[in-house]
Amino acid sequence: MLPFLPEPSLSYTQQNRTAVLLLNLGTPDAPTAQAVRPYLKSFLTDRRVVELPKWLWYPILHGLVLTLRPKKSAHAYEKIWFKEGSPLEVYTARQAAALAKRMPDLIVRHAMTYGNPSVADVLSELKAQGAGRLLVIPMYPQYAASSSGAAVDKVCEQLLLQRNQMSVRTVSRFYDDTGYIDAMKNHILRYWAEHGRGKKLMLSFHGVPQKHYDLGDPYPDECRHTAKLLAEALELTEDQYVVSFQSQFGRAKWVTPSTQDLFGKLPKQGVTELDVFCPGFLADCLETMEEIALMGREQFYEAGGKSYRYIPCLNDNPDWIDALVALAEENLGGWR
């Protein structure tokens, strides 16, 4: 077996196009246990995601997690699945299409760290189209080793297989980007104008294990910085918003406060009207549509809440597309 992938039948002068790759986490191909299992396996065997020795983690993963979780996750996916497919895939594809329309001189594609469209397939297609330069934008405003780091790893794995390697730039983070903050501000204000406004705004980010933070992962700090900038843009006082972290799994300690815990505590503290927005998610997905919009509502009402509004992610919001164009232009530099 050859150590490198075959190169496209293009001369070196034909491999001078510039491509932009929007890279998101991933999704199963269908809302079924059969489709969820391989997706979970690829996700949960990544050492960036679960930092445990294989001898300890793999028996748990194969003996329990991959036996029990696929059916449960498939049921959750069924609740939020679109006719066109997974919401995460649909919205990320729309973002890429909108960016391509605004930057017609570039090749713009999207891929998933886990699942389809795979990084391997998309990079192969980009090379065949003559892309010699690649700007990778992991769709995570706040850097975490388990998300942004894992995404860049996938690209680097493919570079190791290329005989004629592409020139690559990556956008590691944009948690304080003015366009991103303004897009969220405008999006939330429009939502409030149309649907009304609760007494408190919860800004819920995906969680990470506390150990990751203790070992130097900047993610929680960047999340809190984003929340502060967004709150200032919305002219909120400190008692009008709260920052939390969701989607914990396993027995390890995770960064706090927990979104799920706050759903139970806030009504008892007199907060019965709550709006929830997830700044770290640029496209709606299982963690926002099922965990927050559906399950979060149930948890909040069961604890005594009276009004609950989930504010959708930016998705293909025009203001966000404007910000994404500006972000790409800034990082492309002399490549355009």
UniProtKB/Swiss-Prot annotation:
GO biological process: heme biosynthetic process
InterPro entries according to UniProt: Ferrochelatase, Ferrochelatase_AS, Ferrochelatase_C, Ferrochelatase_N
Keyword Secreted belongs to the record: no
One of the record's GO cellular component terms: cytoplasm
Binding site for Fe cation: 206, 287
SUPFAM superfamilies: Chelatase (SSF53800)
Pathway of action: Porphyrin-containing compound metabolism; protoheme biosynthesis; protoheme from protoporphyrin-IX: step 1/1
Catalytic activity: heme b + 2 H(+) = protoporphyrin IX + Fe(2+)
Keyword Cell membrane attributed: no
Stored CDD domains: Ferrochelatase_C, Ferrochelatase_N
Molecular function GO labels: ferrochelatase activity; metal ion binding
Keyword list, A-Z: Cytoplasm, Heme biosynthesis, Iron, Lyase, Metal-binding, Porphyrin biosynthesis
Enzyme Commission code: 4.98.1.1
Subcellular location: Cytoplasm
Pfam families, alphabetized: Ferrochelatase
Homology family: Belongs to the ferrochelatase family.
Biological role: Catalyzes the ferrous insertion into protoporphyrin IX.
Matching PANTHER family: FERROCHELATASE (PTHR11108), FERROCHELATASE, MITOCHONDRIAL (PTHR11108:SF1)
Protein name: Ferrochelatase
Native organism: Neisseria meningitidis serogroup A / serotype 4A (strain DSM 15465 / Z2491)
